[in-house]
Design a protein with these regions (language model features):
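Cys/His-rich metal-coordination motifs, chiefly Zn-binding "fingers/knuckles"
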Residues: 1-33, 41
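Short acidic/polar N-terminal linker immediately downstream of export determinants
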Residues: 2-5, 38-48, 59-122, 132-153, ...
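Intrinsically disordered, low-complexity peptide-like regions
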Residues: 4-10, 22, 78, 219, ...
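Beta-strand-connecting loop/turn residues
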Residues: 14-16, 110, 131-133, 177, ...
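Extended, compositionally simple hydrophobic/Ser/Thr-rich segments
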Residues: 84-87, 91-104, 148-269
Length: 269
């Protein structure tokens, strides 16, 4: 039962004016209903805002780690660059993420050199899993480095995987076996040498530059706007999607599946 806000007189539900003092009361009822509606909506509105904010934050964190491993907050490198050698041997595969610049060089022995700011280098994780050398930032670590570089010496290589905007080169390898390459998150690999067969997968705008790396046969999968150049004269099996493009040098037998605006073309030396 409503009451007049002016004199406190009890009112009928349908009353538009207070019979005692004549004060309009219709607006009071409407205001009460509006306030009740606002109170019922407030928890949902607040919850919606919180959910949107969390989604945006997660998106920023994901993109930052995907393209380089750096968040828009975190520590800043001192500018004092040091190089540390990691005591790891007996690996034939390399996995590097978090936006490193990488050189992979053929050599008679193993060496792993990491270069970064002196106040950040301890947050770089270098380990071995099976026959694979793994280099990345430690989990949940973010910083802006003056330099983030890895130089890897190894006698033989059978797999290279770059992610998170890692850019690198490999040279000196004359391989009689197949080489597997996996690039994601805008990574890039330039390679000089040769192998019997190349199996390559590139996604997320990555680039494979193998114009100076000769192979007999190749299986290439490009997606998400990735690009590649390869050199061969044997069989080329290619699956291209999402606006990707593949250049080839030589006269291979082609078996190509294009979709999503992708393309393939022959190029000169």
């Amino acid at each position: 039962m409503p009451f007049c806000r002016n004199c406190g007189n009890e009112l009928d539900e349908e009353a538009q004016f207070c019979p005692k003092c004549g004060t309009p009361v219709k607006n009071q009822v409407m205001e009460k209903q509006v306030r009740a509606r606002q109170r019922s909506m407030s928890p949902w509105l607040i919850a919606g805002i919180v959910i949107v904010a969390v989604i945006v934050l997660i998106g920023i964190i994901f993109i930052a780690f995907l393209f380089g491993g750096f968040l828009p907050f975190g520590r800043v490198g001192s500018g004092n660059i040091i190089t540390r050698e990691e005591p790891i041997n007996d690996f034939s595969a390399v996995e590097v993420g978090s936006g490193f610049n990488v050189q992979v060089l053929q050599a008679s022995s193993y060496r792993v050199l990491i270069t970064a700011d002196d106040n950040l280098i301890d947050d770089i994780q270098v380990s071995k899993s099976g026959n694979t050398l793994q280099i990345s930032l430690r989990p949940f670590v973010s910083f802006t480095a003056s330099s983030l570089k890895a130089v890897i010496y190894m006698p033989n290589v059978d797999r290279i995987q770059f992610s998170g905007g890692t850019i690198g080169s490999a040279s000196g390898f004359q391989l009689s076996h197949e080489l597997r390459v996996e690039l994601s998150g805008g990574s890039r690999l330039d390679m000089i040498g040769e192998a019997n067969k190349l199996i390559a997968s590139c996604s997320g705008g990555s680039r494979l530059n193998f114009g100076d790396f000769k192979v007999n046969d190749a299986e290439v999968n490009l997606s998400g706007g990735s690009q590649g150049t390869i050199r061969l004269d044997g069989n080329l099996n290619a699956d291209l999607s999402g606006g990707s493009h593949l250049n080839y040098i030589g006269n291979p037998t082609l078996n190509v599946n294009n979709s999503g605006g992708s393309s393939i073309s022959k190029t000169s030396n």
